[in-house]
Amino acid sequence: MLRVSRTKLGRLSPSLSRGLHHKAVMALRREDVNAWERRAPLAPRHVKGITNLGYKVLIQPSNRRAIHDKEYVKAGGILQEDISEACLILGVKRPPEEKLMPKKTYAFFSHTIKAQEANMGLLDEILKQEIRLIDYEKMVDHRGIRVVAFGQWAGVAGIINILHGMGLRLLALGHHTPFMHIGMAHNYRNSGQAVQAVRDAGYEISLGLMPKSIGPLTFVFTGTGNVSKGAQEIFNELPCEYVEPHELKEVSQNGDLRKVYGTVLSRHHHLVRKTDGVYDPVEYDKYPERYISRFNTDIAPYTTCLINGIYWEQNTPRLLTRQDAQSLLAPGKSPVAGVEGCPALPHKLVAICDISADTGGSIEFMTECTTIERPFCMYDADQHIIHDSVEGSGILMCSIDNLPAQLPIESTEYFGDMLYPYVEEMILSDATQPLESQNFSPVVRDAVIASNGMLSNKYKYIQKLRENREHAQSLSMGTKKKVLVLGSGYVSEPVLEYLLRDDSIEITVGSDMKNQIEQLGKKYNINPVSLHVGKQEEKLSSLVATQDLVISLLPYVLHPLVAKACIASKVNMITASYITPALKELEKSVEDAGITVIGELGLDPGLDHMLAMETIDKAKEVGATIESYVSYCGGLPAPECSDNPLRYKFSWSPVGVLMNIMQPATYLLNGKVVNAVGGVSFLDSVTPMDYFPGLNLEGYPNRDSTKYAEIYGIPSAHTLLRGTLRYKGYAKALSGFVKLGLINRDAFPALQPDANPLTWKELLCDLVGISSSSKCDVLKEAVFKKLGGDTTQLEALEWLGLLGDEQVPQAESLVDALSKHLAVKLSYGPGEKDMIVMRDSFGIRHPSGHLENKTIDLVVYGDVNGFSAMAKTVGLPTAMAAKMLLDGEIQAKGLMGPFSKEIYGPILERIKAEGIMYTTQSTIKL
């Protein structure tokens, strides 16, 4: 059984008893804060001691209280609903504000001493009703040590819970352990039953029944107070050995599997001065900001389970930050080799029991408490999300804020033993009289938070804390995060919509498209600014200087100009486009400025990178290698909207799409570098796709794929290809344009503004070398011959009106004129939708020799009268990365793409909430 000291009950302070007041009445109110609160501040034997002194004790009826009402009645208590007769009302947790009675003395845990915002309404009501509030938390002795607390039982319940949770988590990771037979603390009638279950588990451990592949288990206890001691009482029932913190590394790797290892951590074990690595306790108490914690590097990497019982104070180092968690969850080389049925742990740190329940405190990523009914959650540091399942990636977390309620009878008796010596002086409290007139001991007097309608002198600081917080809140409301979005095209809307969900973000949109920014200004709460980035560099610089972040949705050729302005003003930057050589040249300047510039955050490039890196990183975690990677992606009209010769439609300028087929491409195929020539040989590189057969797709290679062996970290790949998807027939139709010379960026004087207008018929006559006055039949015959006798290509030209009398748009070049024409002919009509299709294929060679063929499919449709599929899949990942930068989720500095888990992890999770879903499928070849 637990070694819990009990106070011998007898008469209370004689001096107080001699002053017995015949009207002094005490009441135990029932707890109503939540369904699990079954404790009371006093047990029946304490009530008996009080009634024996002649005091009247009222007991408010409660079927929820763990100790039955009749036990209190036997002890002399009077069971009744109305407790208004009492001058002292005792409880454990706060009462509802509407149930407070004026000019009474109340004692409970108020959680007001830090000006906790959630309880300031309660404090205001206490002041209004001139209630005297005694807070158990502030009942301390002359050394400042609490004399009334449930801490030991929080430690007891907490470690029982986390042992149960570890059993579940280890099972999810593929391991049955003796911890499976330990239940939650409240499943036991008393701690003795729980201790027996722990002993049984310990017996199995001592027999060597722990899985070998998980290695020795280590438990780290922070703090030396009652919480830590209570947890250690239970831990000691296991076959345990305590070691010094510096010995953890050795035992975590080479320890005896027939025992578990524990270490008790004090400040001097992990806190060091930043300048010289020394710990000075006196200096630390005065200047904690001069110190850092080495817990993340010296202790945590060798910890299986952390039992945290310390609170975090401002300016003190945290035990673990989110970045620490990312590092700790990175797969390391296990000292024990695992096999498929007996895997090694993905990382050493399996679980954290944060008994302090201090949200956002010493464990930074513990941002919300768990509950007795839902005791566990998993923190996935890569994606920075918390989920309820014990499966998947992450650290198991247990952070229940009312742990002693799980062992309510023993907690009540333990707490009552400590409170009992002070009860009589509290009974004699008369809240109608000045506090100074009361004959209180220092322990009780110093715990009075409020009396006679005002805060006690010792706690007047609470009002100052409230004022400071309110001032800070008003400042934060007035200080918004400023974002400059450059560009007002179709991608900008989902970016604006996503970011403006956060009221603390203020967006300025800069564009030279007056109509577009005016429309955006009507729809969204933005500051529209007329700006031509290429021609107004000074205006761009002044705008950038006032921002926290710049998002460039401009053509890629303008990104270096924007980046230079960001570097000069040390402002972070985001873009969806490729990191071009011109942008890459600024890498050193970006690093020197200490800013973050992230590119390739859209769809392709963007989501394709993220899906690839997630798969590659997971393969590496299990020791597999990537033998092949093929990725095709395309933005297309929905099938029902593809009824034109190109099987394609444009939602933005077609120039980039048209010029793409003129560019050469390089890829790796079965170990050989293949150079695909663009232009007239473009069709030679087009391949029919055998997936999604109902879509009848074709694809062709895009840009230089070979460089991704280094970017993705897959030098083992013998095949690397990234390409573009289109409906079958697209390539052939565009090949006709190439044959005629229409896809040409050279200046064409006949289309300049000062030239005479031309019709398409006249232009085509010129291109095929016949008189502009030739009849249509003659032109068709000449064009047909130029096309090599391809009827399909000729019909495409006719359908598009390129052999008729429609005027050619004025333009700098032939391709610009064709682009303007197609933008009108092949634009999306009302109610028409687009779609994007992506297929990533991987060949993954596992250590066993098996080859896994894995595919990832992403298919997204546009919304009728809403965002297009392309706008969503480009804009939303870009906006998410922007929000992550603003919120401090991305800490890395420099020029980068979305290749790290810090970036791609959260985005791949968050796009699902926006309806962007991808599916995976794998087959294994022996």
From Swiss-Prot:
> Where are the N6-acetyllysine residues found in this chain?
K48, K56, K93, K128, K138, K286, K458, K523, K535, K584, K707, K739, K761, K780
What SMART domains does the record tag this protein with?
AlaDh_PNT_C (SM01002), AlaDh_PNT_N (SM01003)
Locate the residues binding L-saccharopine: S577, Y578, D604, R703, T724, L725, R726
Q: Which InterPro entries match?
A: AASS, AlaDH/PNT_N, AlaDH/PNT_NAD(H)-bd, NAD(P)-bd_dom_sf, Sacchrp_dh-like_C, Sacchrp_dh_NADP-bd
Q: Where is this region: Saccharopine dehydrogenase?
A: 477-926
**Record keywords, A-Z:** Acetylation, Mitochondrion, Multifunctional enzyme, NAD, NADP, Oxidoreductase, Transit peptide
- Pathway assigned to this chain's UniProt record: Amino-acid degradation; L-lysine degradation via saccharopine pathway; glutaryl-CoA from L-lysine: step 1/6; Amino-acid degradation; L-lysine degradation via saccharopine pathway; glutaryl-CoA from L-lysine: step 2/6
GO CC annotation: cytoplasm; mitochondrion
Region: Lysine-ketoglutarate reductase; residue ranges are 28-455
The EC designation for this entry is: 1.5.1.8, 1.5.1.9
The entry's localization annotation reads:
Mitochondrion
Catalysis: reaction(s): L-saccharopine + NADP(+) + H2O = L-lysine + 2-oxoglutarate + NADPH + H(+); L-saccharopine + NAD(+) + H2O = (S)-2-amino-6-oxohexanoate + L-glutamate + NADH + H(+)
- List, alphabetically, the CDD domains matched: LKR_SDH_like
Q: What does this protein do?
A: Bifunctional enzyme that catalyzes the first two steps in lysine degradation.
Question: How does it associate, per the subunit comment?
Answer: Homotetramer.
* Protein's UniProt name: Alpha-aminoadipic semialdehyde synthase, mitochondrial
Species the sequence originates in: Bos taurus
- What is this protein's gene name? AASS
